[in-house]
Amino acid sequence: EAWPHFAWVRKLLEMPTISQALRRFDRDARVLGDDDQRFVGSTVRYLTQGVDWDGHPVGATVLPIVATVGFGDALTLPAGLPPTPVRSASIASDVLGAFRLRTKQVVSAPGSVFDARYPPGGGRKLRVAVLGGGPAACAAAYYLARQRDAYEVSLYTMGWRLGGKCAAGRNRNAHDRIEEHGLHAFLGFYRNAIRTVGEVYRDAGRSLASDEGPVSGAFRPQAHVGVLDRFDDRWTYFPTPMGPNDRVPGRIPPGASAGRPEAAAIPLGAILRRIADDLQDAVGGDGDAPLDRVFSLLSAPWREAMASLVAWVDREGAIALERFVETPPAASRTKRWMIAILEQVRSGLAWYYEDRARSSRTAYFQWGGLDTLLTIARGVLVESTLDFDDLDDRDMIAWLLEHGLAEEHASISTITQVYETLFAHAPDLPYRVADLACGVGLRWFLLVSFGYDGHPAYDFRWSCPETLMTPYYEALRAHGAEIHFFHRVEGITIAGDGAERRLAAVKLRVQATVRGAGPYDPFLADVAAPGCPPAWPMVPNYDQLVEGEVLRERGIDLEDVYADWPGVGERELHWGRDFDVCILGVPLGALPTIVAPLLDPASPHADPRWQALVERTALVQTVSAHLWFDRPASAMFDTSARAVERTGDADPRRGLLTGFVHPVGSLGEMTPLVAAERWPEPTPQLLTYHTGALLAEARLPPPGAAWRDYPAQQREHWRSLFHQWLREHHRSIFDAGPADFDDLLAALRVPDGPAREGLERLWAQAFNVACQPSDLYVLSRPGETKHRLAPSASGVRFLLLAGDWTKTDMNCGCVEAATQSGMLAARALSNEPAYVWRVGY
């Protein structure tokens, strides 16, 4: 087959060249020595024709790359590289971020090469308008705002607070209790998010580190992470076997900022070591040797076979291991041998556990975990891919079954916890997990299991927005960024069509008028536990608004797109006058009306890629409930001798767990937050957050006052659904709590005031349902992730994108994906931040 010449070069080097009219050699792309075989750089969206961000004409010319590549005899350079310069717009690409070469190399780029950063035009700062107030928008705004000599940043957000789906507030009518959107925590592999929090804290005059640990200024390590699984017709709590390690969360690997990233290899060695360790525990755990006898009948004794696999992986470097994984089994005797060993071990274990897993909870959970790990290892080797995006057209469980997972393990919580965490539910009743893109799910599973730094998870020391969004606000203000609350994005105006599309204007709805000349102060003045950052209110600070009394009297929710409130006027931002570049950080659910010119087939500005993104990416309504109890954890969770023997943990706390009955499959014990609230003595002794999702493929009505009753109807529906769920299942989750449902209601703590009995005590708790377009969670269903757009691939000049709905390494809804997206959007414009952690598989 005849490949275009540039495609040959790109395939050979596994990287694109960077061309933006001026040739640049990124500081992040330096190879420091022959011992380092990785070539890392930041890749921005290619600009080969048209105009740049400043409106200057661009006529980029890409010359052929001359490379000396030490592949040995395994590969030769393709013939026919062009002797003349290549001038083509076809090299425009969506590829972003870090890339690498796996061999020592010398790359010669003809012409002058110099170190540079993208300069602001016309001797002035570049004006950047950031639309949205969630973690992605704030990350993009922060990394640009701190480059004060180059950028003027203005952020526009709806309502009175930052946070997006991380927003929350203090209920002034309920002892300033924290009422969150849902259950939020940082997982230990959130490297970009934790590192960014550390930098934000520094610039906000706060410290992420303390005497308690490197991130304890904002987070509490969560030692209790587990799952609930149904065994023998009974729900059982299983702590996950993940202890702390000595890696520091958020720390940039040594040398990475100068072009030496950490190895991005799939953790094959960690998987094999975990299998070997678990096998050893299984053999030594029951005092006999039937498993030894099983493996002695195999072609290779299991101990020696597993030891050989682990030793071989440990000997190989990351580059050799990646090359090995990508080699087809037919071309590698070593790979065929490894696959055979894994299959034989799994066959032996299936025989060994056949009866034990039916009678022993421990054996059931142990065998399910081993089967999952063996299947993943076998599947990755057989598929021969390091790019898990290649697997995203298939469902994760279907892929595991295809590679030999036992049928009975398709519903084990070891696997379904990934579905629950990413809200991958079926679109019809009964509630059940379903439809998770395989690559997304496998990547999440491996990062949770093997990729964490320090602890598997971290709870916020205060509420999510107080811990995360307050410092963002403080840091942005410290860097001179303007934050415009009460500005809802309503639409964008596009000029030109096809490759000439450009952003001409942004339409905003001004929701309220701030009194006086000063900026709006978003915080509560008198709510702060010791060391707690300023808190966000549940409603605006009405006394600062001209329309404050009207909004208060009418109960208008400025975060409700169905509210009967027209706002106080319109505002239009024009390119060239109000902004030079715009970053669209609005959630996907709210985009259809905003980017309508790109979606309407009849519009001259229509873009099929945007149509595919919006129409083929499913969204879901998440739900949550917070319960305060007058009883401690020891009175609600089983700590009997039998439970301690089963779990190996006498601590009654549950921490973070998932895998329970839909639609509320996850629980977080958040009791430490009570100390940051203002309850009278005696304070609540237990606080639990419950979260889940309703049916997938949420279809909300269009914004407008015609649907003003919709949010209230949804909230009432969710309260009724939660009541039914809690009545039916409270004994399974609160396994040491009251047996009678009325007694459970009596154990709930309610705010002071009129006496409440029965269900009134439940209704006094906190409930939330995603009933706004911007609240909807973006799913990662099979075949859908390929429609995501990269942060620099909007197809509209002067428009960048930020959000967990964009193309990232994670391709799923989480703060890590949102933060990475914001970082990449900022870097596409400025080449900062210099280092962005990439998963690598």
Which residue ranges define each predicted feature?
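Extreme N-terminal leader/targeting segments of oxidoreductases
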Residues: 3-128, 146-150, 541-570
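Active-site/ligand-binding neighborhood in enzyme catalytic cores
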Residues: 44-46, 50, 55, 280-568, ...
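Glycine-rich FAD pyrophosphate-binding loop
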Residues: 145-170
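N-terminal Rossmann-like FAD-binding beta1-loop-alpha1 element of flavoenzymes
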Residues: 126-154
